[in-house]
Amino acid sequence: MTILSAITSISRPNKASKSSVSSFGGASLSMGSNSVACGGCGGGSSGPRGPGGVAVGVAVDVNINLGVVVGGVLGLVGGILGGGGSSGSCGCH
């Protein structure tokens, strides 16, 4: 599945859902139905890396409802860009 198809894939528009994005480097992102992106920090040292430390081949597990598409796109970008670096984690602030 490509990132574009994951973003445009919308399921269960009437039900609140949670989106989750992770990369090979261990960075993860989750988003509740309130459109607040959580995570995007704490990439590990494992997995193939492309230029700038961004993990190549992002594994995406997405269940986006219609009300959180914009937040999901922004959170996805933040999760990918935050994927490099030392181990750790970030939550909702």
UniProtKB/Swiss-Prot annotation:
Biased composition, class Polar residues, residue ranges: 1-14
InterPro entries per the UniProt record, alphabetical: HssA/B-like_chaperone (IPR050533), HssA/B-related (IPR008455)
Record's compositionally biased regions (Low complexity): 16-26
Positions of the UniProt region annotated as Disordered: 1-26
Pfam families linked to this entry: Coiled
GO biological process, one term: sorocarp development
Membrane-spanning residues: none
Family according to the record: Belongs to the hssA/B family.
Protein name: Protein hssA
Protein species of origin: Dictyostelium discoideum
